[in-house]
Amino acid sequence: MIFLSHLIDNNTPTYGNSSDIKISHATCMDHGDTANSLSIKMNNHIGTHIDLPKHFDINGKVLEQYPACEWVFNKVQLVNIPLEEEEMLSVSHFKKKLREDTEVLIIKTGFEKFRHQESYWKNNPGVLPEVGTWLRKNFGSIKIIGFDFISLTCFQRREIGRISHRAFLESNKNNEPIRIIEDMKLSEIDTDPKKLIVLPLMIKGADGVPVSIIAF
């Protein structure tokens, strides 16, 4: 049993290096207070987090519209697809056949090794829109896709990234949106988990939240 989420701290990388994280002591026993507590200020799309449909669809689902059963999964598939700086994930990368009953698709690229370097947020890989379209059309059982780089959107190809997010998250009458988990910790996992529990930070009306992920 392991966590597939990174710890959040003041050095957590952010997409485009554009969001500040500030975690500080609100009260501190070392300073004479009766208890310890923290003050936390950050964007909701920080660290290992999930993008929900509302993030790119004005009428999309928000957090509280997903019941508890939508966060526990027994059919999880891990695929290894090494990606370089600014490389775009395409349908052609999926040489390993995906199982038709997969609920969570985890893509391990190895880009996590750059997480404490500028290139992690500035030159990250991205995902082409065709992947979202293809997965939704051919693998209707997939509820979530996750990966070990900072965003579905390559920072150097932002317009394509916006289209890609919509390909996964926008509602249509043919198939359900696929939720997106970005910035996963995958360095300690090499095989398909038997079970995955995704625990979202419960914020009303959220279009995305940090998640704690436990793999069994």
Residue ranges and their predicted role:
Residues M1-F216:
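Active-/binding-site microenvironments in catalytic and ligand-binding cores
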